[in-house]
């Protein structure tokens, strides 16, 4: 999938396929919730354990992403968010991340309201980012994946 990264540049994000091939034939869709018929059984497992994100380590290696930073979004959704809150443009200052402060506290987003809440977490991260904050996010991400701890 194409996502928008640092400086507003598009890049291809790598993920394991978790949805059926024609899942977005009617246009881009938000996160698939419980019982979404577009999700495969293997895909549900991958998403529940955040394993669908592993291929993004290649994006980190290529320099498109960082380990920690705001999650990259598709242009379609960025346009919707920017209509409500133009501060989204500040996120283009840094590389998007495989994990983020917003994902830990806001989870997956399936509504515009949740996307705007995620933006507030991302802006908080942008203002307060430091090595210590990044280490805390890495630790919390590990706890979330290994033990299912929610924050």
List each model region and its residues.
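Conserved small/aromatic sequence motifs within transmembrane helices
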Residues: 1-151
């Amino acid at each position: 999938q194409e996502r928008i990264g640092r400086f507003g540049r598009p890049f291809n994000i790598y993920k394991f396929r978790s949805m059926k091939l024609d899942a977005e034939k009617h246009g881009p869709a938000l996160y698939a919730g419980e019982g979404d018929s577009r999700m495969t059984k293997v895909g549900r497992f991958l998403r529940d354990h955040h394993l669908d994100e592993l291929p993004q380590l290649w994006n980190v290696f290529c320099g498109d992403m960082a380990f920690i930073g705001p999650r990259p979004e598709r242009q379609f959704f960025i346009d919707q968010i920017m209509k409500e809150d133009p501060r989204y443009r500040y996120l283009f200052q840094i590389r998007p991340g495989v994990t983020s402060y917003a994902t830990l506290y806001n989870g997956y987003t399936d509504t515009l309201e949740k996307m705007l809440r995620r933006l507030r977490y991302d802006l908080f991260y942008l203002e307060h980012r430091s090595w210590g904050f990044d280490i805390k996010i890495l630790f919390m991400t590990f706890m979330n994946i290994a033990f299912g701890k929610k924050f």
